[in-house]
Structure formats: structure tokens, C-alpha cells
């Protein structure tokens, strides 16, 4: 009888831990301090950064940030001062995108079905509901709790959803500063590459390498010519 009660206690603890784990992102978002912004100022912000929804997928060579919930995967990209967020379903099928102008860093997260877009320089968060009908802008108080939330959930390159671990990887580009893959590891430790932009990054690295090599050759040639002239 005693063993039966112990087993029930273990089962109860297991389910409680699962509930806490699955709601971690949502509850942590509630801990940060935000203030609503008026309709006029919201409109001005959305207009000034040219925030808009797009229906064509734009492919990039590296992933800047990502977010996961039960039904969606969001991938964030930098294209100079233009930022893009591609939204995919849980089978990695493209659905739609958002794009906007921003000169600083940005990050993304989900609060349940709501997409949260953080503009770090401006200290604001833009939230878009699942139906894509409501866009809300709030100012965020910059404090220790906010920084901890950013580090743990928004900036993190490793995230957990429904006992599955997701992380950004450089793939086989060991010395690359860019993340080219989003990898999923399930509860049985089976690994699956969901998105892979490594081939696109090879082209970029080749172009950059060629430019650097050309610059070094020109520099060495100038040094050699200068030494020869002095002789």
C-alpha cells in the first residue's frame, strides 16, 4: 500500500513538472514590466519602421534568432537594416512573414499563440495575435528581470518545447560566426535538422574569402613594390 502511495506521488510530481516546463515561456513573459502605448504612437512606430506582413518566403544564408510554440516555428533574419521573420507550421511548411526596418538588434518569442518581436534599442515589444488581426506595441522597462528574460528565452540559441529541444547550429561550418541550421532533438534523443542554409553560406564564405585573399595579395604586392623601389 505504501509503495502505491509513493508511486502516485511520483506521478503527480511528474505531471506538475511538465505543466511548469510547458508554460515557462508564457509565465516568464508576464514577469517583465511593460507599459501600453497609445494608438497614435503605436501607429507612428509601425509606420516609421515600415512593419508589414508578407506572403512570399525570402531565403537567407543564416539564422539570427528563432522561437517555437506548439504549432509554429518563427525564424528571424538580418538583411542589413531590414529584418525578416518567417513563420512556418510545425511541419516546417512556410506560411507568411513579417518585415521591418531596424538599425539595432531584435529578438522573437511566443507567448502562447502570440508572436512577440523585441526591438532592443527602442525597448519596445510588438505583439501579433494568432489571427494576425491585432498588433500591439508596448514599452518595456529595462531592468534585471527583463535582461534575464532576454538571455533565457529571446537570445537563447537553445529552446525547449513539449520535451523537444531545439537549437541553432553552424552545421559543418565549424569556424563560421553564423548559424545555418535549426536542429530538433526529441525526448528519445533522435536528432532532426529542420532547416539547413549551409549551402547558401558556402557561397557567402567563398565570396568573402576571395575578397580577403585578393586584398592580401594587393597589399603584399604594394609592400614588395615599395621595398624594391627603396633598393
Predicted segments, located by residue:
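N-terminal secretory signal peptides that target proteins for export/translocation
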Residues: 1-2
Amino acid at each position: 500500500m505504501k509503495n502505491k502511495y509513493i508511486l502516485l506521488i511520483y506521478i503527480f510530481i511528474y505531471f506538475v513538472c511538465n505543466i511548469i516546463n510547458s508554460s515557462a515561456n508564457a509565465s516568464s513573459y508576464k514577469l517583465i514590466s511593460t507599459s501600453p502605448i497609445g494608438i497614435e504612437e503605436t501607429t507612428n512606430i509601425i509606420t516609421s519602421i515600415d512593419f508589414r506582413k508578407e506572403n512570399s518566403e525570402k531565403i537567407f544564408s543564416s539564422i539570427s534568432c528563432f522561437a517555437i510554440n506548439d504549432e509554429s516555428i518563427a525564424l528571424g533574419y538580418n538583411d542589413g537594416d531590414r529584418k525578416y521573420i518567417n513563420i512556418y507550421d510545425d511541419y516546417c511548411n512556410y506560411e507568411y512573414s513579417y518585415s521591418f526596418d531596424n538599425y539595432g538588434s531584435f529578438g522573437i518569442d511566443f507567448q502562447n499563440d502570440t508572436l512577440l518581436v523585441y526591438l532592443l534599442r527602442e525597448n519596445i515589444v510588438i505583439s501579433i495575435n494568432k489571427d494576425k488581426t491585432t498588433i500591439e506595441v508596448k514599452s518595456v522597462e529595462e531592468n534585471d528581470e527583463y535582461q534575464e528574460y532576454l538571455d533565457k528565452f529571446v537570445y537563447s540559441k537553445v529552446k525547449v518545447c513539449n520535451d523537444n529541444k531545439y537549437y541553432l547550429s553552424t552545421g559543418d561550418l565549424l569556424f563560421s560566426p553564423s548559424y545555418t541550421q535549426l536542429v530538433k532533438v526529441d525526448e528519445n534523443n533522435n536528432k532532426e535538422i529542420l532547416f539547413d542554409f549551409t549551402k547558401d553560406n558556402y557561397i557567402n564564405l567563398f565570396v568573402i574569402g576571395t575578397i580577403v585573399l585578393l586584398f592580401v595579395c594587393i597589399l603584399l604586392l604594394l609592400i614588395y613594390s615599395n621595398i624594391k623601389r627603396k633598393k
